[in-house]
Amino acid sequence: MENKIKVFENKQVRTVWNAEEEEWYFSVVDVVSVLTDSANPRKYWSVLKTRLKAEGSEVTTNCSQLKMLAPDGKMRMRDAMKTRDILRLVQSIPSPKAEPFKMWLAQAGSERRDDKE
C-alpha cells in the first residue's frame, strides 16, 4: 500500500493506493473537512457515522481502517473508503462543494488506473 497526499482547494486529503485491489482509499475525516469546513471534522464524522448507522445506511459498513500519516508524523489507523463509497458519503453531507469535489474525486481516483494502461 502506498500513502499519498492529494490536494483539493488547498486542503490535504490523505489517500492510500491498494495495488492488490487497484483502488484508492480516501481519509474520511479529510473529506469531511473539505466539504464542511468544520472546526472539528473528526467529531462531525463521528456524529454523521452514528446517524447513518441508525438510518441503516451501508456507507459506514464499507469503511476500512488503514494506516495514514497523522499530523504528528506517525502512521495511525484512520477511517478510509474507496472512491465509490466516498461518493455515497458526499451525498449525505450538505455542501456547496459537493459537485466540485465529486469531479475532483473522479480525476483523483482514476490517476493510478491511467498509469497502468
Describe each region flagged by the PLM.
Residues 33-58:
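Compact nucleic-acid interaction/catalytic patches
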Residues 1-26, 33-39, 61-117:
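Positively charged, aromatic-accented nucleic-acid-binding surfaces
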